[in-house]
């Protein structure tokens, strides 16, 4: 991903979730994806897809069961 794409995605996510604590980067990975952090903690990866001239982005976030609060 180009730095301009990363900056646009970061602004979109910050606006959508209402926080400036979301950070993308620091740089694009070899496969064209970029890491997403919230307050310094890694939370997921954004993948870029281009098909038939249209670009889309997929955000993947894995949640470990041990990180969840106890069941009620």
Kindly give the residue locations of the regions a language model identified.
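Terminal leader/tail segments of proteins
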Residues: 1-72
């Amino acid at each position: 991903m180009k730095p301009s794409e990363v900056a646009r995605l970061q602004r979109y996510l910050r606006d959508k979730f209402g926080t400036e604590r979301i950070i993308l980067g620091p740089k694009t990975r070899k496969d064209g994806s970029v890491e997403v952090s919230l307050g310094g903690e890694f939370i997921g990866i954004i993948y870029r897809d281009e098909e038939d001239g249209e670009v889309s982005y997929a955000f993947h976030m894995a949640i470990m069961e041990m990180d969840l609060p106890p069941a009620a």
